[in-house]
Curated annotation (Swiss-Prot):
This is FMN-dependent NADH:quinone oxidoreductase. Signal peptide: none annotated. Its EC number is 1.6.5.-, 1.7.1.17. Belongs to the azoreductase type 1 family. FMN binds at S10, S16, H17, S18, M96, Y97, N98, F99. Its cofactor is FMN. It comes from the Bacteria. Homodimer. Binds 1 FMN per subunit. The keyword Methyltransferase does not apply.
Length: 202
């Protein structure tokens, strides 16, 4: 039985294309793998705080030297990391906000990319500790940033692929749904293509 960690980041509770595609994937996955389980983290409902000076200080304090207060400061970060470690598949759904990911998703990653927990530094450079996992990134955008020259403005999928690879998750499938601010025909075509890509991930 596999565990899928689903992370939604759209601020919209209704009308989110990225969440709708994640819903589609979850339904299709469970039909094919009925004994698997999904753990959902909706960052719009439980937004993580941005990193503080105290949190950063605790992160870089050796475990054996941390005070009780520092350990408590890292409680949310530790919870996120444990969820990632237990997951076999990570599903991230995100819109594009001003060329990048929502600040909630960035804050989540800031808490999750932690030295000694999800990556370490070696003589050969940084090494990710979450190898062997698969990630699927569903990214929706109002415009089409998949082709030149607008692809240079896309800081969503390149960043997420880099961040996931940094912690050892190299098997990343990018599912993009561009043109969500276009006409109905264009939207339907984009969603259909995204769903086909998602079905190929089952």
């Amino acid at each position: 039985m596999a565990t899928v960690l689903r992370i939604d980041s759209s601020a919209l509770s209704n009308g989110s294309h990225s969440k709708a595609l994640a819903d589609f994937f979850q339904t299709q996955w469970l039909e094919k793998h009925p004994t698997d389980s999904f753990q959902t983290l909706d960052l719009s409902q439980t937004p993580p705080p941005h990193l503080s000076e105290a949190t950063i200080g605790a992160m870089f304090t050796p475990t054996e030297e941390r005070s009780k207060e520092q350990t408590q400061q890292l409680a949310l970060s530790t919870d996120y990391i444990e969820q990632l470690k237990k997951a076999d598949v990570i599903l991230i759904s995100t819109p594009m906000y001003n060329f990048g990911i929502p600040s909630t998703l960035k804050a989540y990653l800031d808490h999750s990319l932690r030295v000694g927990e999800t990556f370490v530094y070696t003589d050969k450079g940084p090494k990710g500790l979450l190898e062997g996992k698969k990630a699927i990134v569903v990214a929706a955008s109002g415009g089409d940033y998949t082709q030149s020259p607008l692809d240079a403005m896309n800081f969503v999928t390149p960043y997420l692929k880099t961040a996931l690879g940094f912690i050892g998750i190299e098997d990343v499938t990018l599912v993009e749904a561009p043109g969500m601010a276009g006409d109905e025909a264009s939207i339907n075509k984009s969603i259909k293509q995204a769903k086909q890509t998602l079905q190929n991930c089952l």
